Amino acid sequence: MTDPKDTINIENVVASTGIGQELDLQSVAMDLEGADYDPEQFPGLVYRTQEPKSAALIFRSGKIVCTGAKSTDDVHESLEIVFDKLRELQIPVDDDPEITVQNIVTSADLGENLNLNAIAIGLGLENIEYEPEQFPGLVYRLDEPSVVALLFGSGKLVITGGKQPTDAEAAVDVIISRLSELGLLNGSF
């Protein structure tokens, strides 16, 4: 049986940074090839990088949010591209702006079907939201690590709120441990 931790896959990394000064987004949008800026639809300028694939949301305040990256390394690489593009436009950017990972979304697979009704009862209502008429997944809020896991009947998981990739591994360990204690997992992990 495959170890569920071996199935963990990073789906999205969101990080934030800033250049410490306000920007004229209209002007930046005209000079930055490939930039999308439609302030009636979204207050930020969107600049997409292809390699690595991500989107930088650049705001008038100078704050920048990078989303869509598949690793923390990709976030840093993507933002370095954005910083270089801004420098080319004569916009001063520090040599090494601080980049903060805000959220890592991962997927995993426990490798077996889950009885979500039994899990909801077994884990107790204080950390669980399960309304199958509204959403097919069970929402499990973990304290340590501080993440939210979505459990689906197929055994698939989505873990969100992590700040580092190891948070997903810790969450899978906690979930396997709790479900095993309750006798709700057949696998021997």
Swiss-Prot record:
Record GO terms (molecular function): DNA binding; DNA-binding transcription factor activity
**Record's keyword annotation contains Transcription:** yes
Q: Extract one GO BP annotation from the record.
A: DNA-templated transcription initiation
Entry's InterPro entries? TBP, TBP_archaea, TBP_CS, TBP_dom_sf
Q: Which UniProt keywords apply?
A: DNA-binding, Repeat, Transcription, Transcription regulation
Gene for this chain: tbp1
Q: What's the protein here called? A: TATA-box-binding protein 1
Family, according to the entry, reads as follows: Belongs to the TBP family.
Q: Where are the sequence repeats?
A: 10-86, 101-179
The organism's lineage is: Archaea, Methanobacteriati, Methanobacteriota, Stenosarchaea group, Halobacteria
* CDD domains for the chain: TBP_archaea
Q: What does this protein do?
A: General factor that plays a role in the activation of archaeal genes transcribed by RNA polymerase. Binds specifically to the TATA box promoter element which lies close to the position of transcription initiation.
